[in-house]
Amino acid sequence: KIPIPTHDKRFSGGMREVEQEVHRVQFLDPATGTGTFVAEAIQQIYDKMKGQQGLWNSYVENHLLPRINGFELLMASYAMAHLKLDLLLKQTGYTGTKNQRFRIYLTNSLEEYHKDTGTLFANWLSAEASEANQIKRDAPVMIVAGNPPYSGISSNNGEWISKLIEDYKYVDGEHFNERKHWLNDDYVKFIRYGQHFIEKNGSGILAYINPHGFLGNPTFRGMRWNLLKTFDKIYTIDLHGNSNIKEESPDGSPDINVFDIQQGVSINIFIKTSKKTESKLSDVFHLDLYGKREEKYQFLVDKSFSMIPFNKLNPEKPYFFFKNS
């Protein structure tokens, strides 16, 4: 059971907390945008339940919507996410019987929960923030996934996330003593944020697509060390496509980014079980994927996770690289 914010005009701020049972497996996209990752998660679940249409309505209301969470900072994207999910569920044949909202909230993921939210926002937004705070504080988030923003010059410099990032500046207890580094990039903060949720829960999966620089840049050695200590298994698919360094395929042919951006990107999956001990570092598995954009897309569509030919790495001091040397 966890405390859930509930509307009650008899209490200060019009809200009170009531203990309720929640599903143990909770999904969170901390940078939901227009809801693409959340929509795909719902679509995948629906596809597995085809042929059980009679159960779908009940499943959505009692077991799906209570598990799916998303945070978004921008009002326009937040509104679009709600519209996209509403249309998707209607297309699946879902017809709601309860007045149940999507658990997509207007909030900044990288800010810690605020206990006195009611004094900070207008009434309608106060309830929104209170429910987001409950997830930040209490929800047993076991899956964190998405495509968080990238920004080398981050404006998310709050005390809470900055303190968490400090952990990435140490390797085996020693500070890395660098003043110029890229640990303040937003995507690094979102990885640390997701890691924090999984650590707090004791087990879970963190899965992002984000810039690939942290895989092999020496300045990220403390970050890699910290991830090695936290997780049991780490899988990375380096999609390359970095036009900043004019990446090419090994055969000299063009290597194209999967997105219309200059930074190369990678798919990263971090898995933690309750059996993990800090003394044992994570196993790391890696794959390089070069070539045309369409070829990369096709590979990812055709291959199930078990079919991907990962290479096992052996990250070593002093840099603990997550890529082939």
Where are each of the predicted segments found?
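SAM-dependent methyltransferase catalytic region
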Residues: 1-236, 246
